[in-house]
Amino acid sequence: MTDNKKYDVVAIGNAMLDVLCEVSEPFLDQEGISKGVMNLVSRERSNNILKLVKPVKETAGGSAANTISTLAKLGLKTGYIGKIADDQQGGVFKKDLIHDSIIYKTAFLDKGNSESTGKCIVLITPDKERTMNTYLGATEYLSDIDIDEELIAYSEWLYLEGYRFDGQESKKAFYKAIEIAKKNKTKIAITLSDSFCVDRHRSDFINLLNESADLVFCNEDELKSLYEVEYIEAAQKLIADTISCVACTCAEKGAYLFHKSSIRRISTKKVSVIDTTGAGDNFASGFLYGLSKNFSLEKCAALGNEIAGEVLTVYGPRIEKSLTNFIKVNA
């Protein structure tokens, strides 16, 4: 970290609990659920889905919060901004952040609001693909007054979760955070989050990335959706003209690193996959950890692949085991 910065990464995202459930392929068809993406659902729909499945695990989640959690376990100084209700689920979420020594000061949802803390029902099919059904709840009410200027100003990186574009108030909050970051020379990383999310907000995303992003995280489907191309290589010139660096994950193929006019594939080791939830979030953790150590972009991507590989072998979006050995090897 530079002398005037107190934090390595501060993130803004959807604060919610993840409920992981194993289901069959026919279940998704019967319930009309689009596979492999994030489906926005109402509280009623969320409750109805839960009546039909048997949860395997319940854990604090949210894409950016998952990234921040792993960064904290890697020893980085982190902060998080996201809205929860003052309820049991919100208490679990907040407790997990505090346990990981993450700075979290966002006020609870106003007591006059009946929404509960957000919940994401993650349906895992036999091929280990995850399909998310997200009730946003309290997180939808994140607004510009929740943006902690000091937290962002004193951070090396601001990490923005694309899912938060699903809401006008939180979109305003994003732009306020970006303004603060630019004013204080805080670098900006943005994750595209989901191909359907990109479809909903393509124009806004492209403008945001072109004008503000120092680093973009995405997967293959999200990148193709963003630039409306059939192959990710076709996006190279569009990226080179506007964005300094894009790290694009491609499942077992590893990751593609777009930097200026070059494109490189960084391979990954094969692992026994149990659940793909949180793989992209943890890739971002490894990459940002590498940047904090001033590693090359290629090594950052390799570390991203390694950390993503760790979470693929467990249920849920977060690594629970100690990362001490990883830190020793990559100090």
Give the role of each language-model region:
Residues 1-81, 91-92:
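Glycine-rich phosphate/adenosyl-contacting loop at the front of the ribokinase-like
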Residues 1-10, 15, 29-35, 52, ...:
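Conserved phosphate-binding/catalytic region of the ribokinase-like
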Residues 4, 151-153, 209-210, 240:
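A short, aliphatic-rich alpha-helical micro-motif
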Residues 68-77, 123-125, 290-293:
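Alpha-helix C-terminal capping segments
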Residues 78, 104, 188-189, 246:
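Hydrophobic beta-strand scaffold residues
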Residues 96-114:
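A glycine-rich helix N-cap at a beta->alpha junction
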Residues 105-111, 122-168:
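Conserved phosphate-binding/catalytic loop of the ribokinase/pfkB sugar-kinase fold
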Residues 157-234, 253-255:
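Conserved beta-alpha-beta core of the PfkB/ribokinase-like small-molecule kinase fold
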